Amino acid sequence: MSRRPEGLIYGVNDRPRLPVLGLMGVQHVMLMSSTLVLPVVLVAEIGGSFEQVRGVVALTMIGCGVGTIVQALRVRGFGSGFLCPNLCGPNFFGISMTAAWLGGLPLMRGMTIVAGLFEAVFAKVIKRLAFLFPPEITGLVVLMVAEGLVPLGTSKFLGITYPDEPISGTNVAVAAATVSIMVVATVWGGGKLRLYAVLMGMVTGYTLALVTGLFGAEHFERLARSPWVALPSIDGMTQLSFRWSLVPAFLIVSVTGALKSMGNLIMCEKVNDADWKAPDLNRISGGLLADSVAVTVSGLIGGMASDTSASNVALSSATGATSRYIGYAAGALFVVLGFFPKISGVLSVMPMPVMGAILVFVTSFMIVSGIQIILASGMDIRKTFAIGLAVIFALSLDVVPSLYAGISGWLRPMFESSLTLATVVAVVVNQLLRARRPGVARTPAKTVAAARRERGGKEMGALDRKAYQQ
């Protein structure tokens, strides 16, 4: 039986009042909209018309909304029962673009369906892989998911689009004001203001961006071209194609997305249980199955692949509102907004400093949560090496990606994502260090983790020197 954390205002099964539900849903929808620029870029790159752009964006929103709703379900092993919203998956963008270049939108749709079906298979076998994911490695997954948000959040905060571009002072000022409002409302605002911290920050940020010209003519031009109400264009929606040469790449991206979703769901578990010790793989399996349905549905209806949103999960932690009913509200609202292009357009053109401020704000919670999970069961010398080596090589991939430019063949996919690399290194090192040499009967000394579990798991782990004597 889980124990409710003290700082939680609305727990996973609480049902907020309708006005609260609506405002919390709007907060999550605004964050879910942050990646709607991806289908715009994809369709434009292959020479698609404005109608096609609008149609793919709308269908992507519908797919994400459906995914958010089914994730909040918990029916006979399907769904996680958590507030874990979906957005247009950045993980899938590169390979979806490749598919669109090679075979247009029909090929992108067909390969997206393949990725969704593969994740369904992965969801069914994850329970058999429990031995590979002890708490310290699941914490690492959460930490690396958060780390993946850092480059995007900081670049948006500083107003940098290209590597050599100078920092924009105006952008930083607006972002700093936006995040300051969020922090003040969260730390000193009390329960009610904390619920709406991000919404208050967004309103402040949009206003300042408008005054300073960061929300300018090009944004209004895009909004002016969009109708108020329109059915999504379904031209060619039933056309699907398939290419064997793209299967390996889509499967790798599918696994990476599943690992990210696993980290998000673990974060959901921890936020909702003060006595959390280890992931519930039955629940995670149900969540991954729901995620696979979201990806498959997105491909079937003609949108881009969706993925669970780390920033939305962190938002629920920051506001203290993790009710799955907020997931129903946000998902339904996102589906409805797919039929109102002008309103969804306002959300999809979020000013750079506002997006940066939100990402910096919510990522802070996820980074700390990942560290807490890693340390919660105590650290010994084996865990230190497994986690330390994984983080070192993962960060090297992000900081100096050219180090691995010469790697090709079947190893190459492992070096496409720091999350994937960190997970593989941690799992392999952990299993190697746990292996016993043949003929040596050795019972390891009781670890700090075991002792703490016997005391009820109330202490948060810290590095203990006695562990190094093993």
Which functions belong to the PLM regions below?
Residues M1-L23, A217-I234, K270-G286, L432-Q470:
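Intrinsically disordered, low-complexity non-transmembrane regions of multi-pass membrane transporters
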Residues P19-T35, I167-V179, Y196, T212, ...:
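Hydrophobic, membrane-embedded alpha-helices of multi-pass small-molecule transporters
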Residues M1-G11, R15, I181-V184, V198-L251, ...:
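Hydrophobic transmembrane alpha-helices of multi-pass solute/ion transporters
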Residues E51-T60, I69-R128, E136:
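Membrane helical hairpin/interfacial module
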Residues I9-Y10, P16-P19, V43-G79, A249-R324:
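Membrane-embedded helical hairpins/re-entrant loop segments and their flanking transmembrane helices
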Residues R54-G55, G77-N91, F131-L140, R194-L199, ...:
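Short, non-helical or kinked segments that cap or interrupt transmembrane helices
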Residues M1-G81, G439, R453-Q469:
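N-terminal alpha-helical transmembrane segments of multi-pass membrane transport
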Residues A99-E218, A330-P444:
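Membrane-embedded alpha-helical modules
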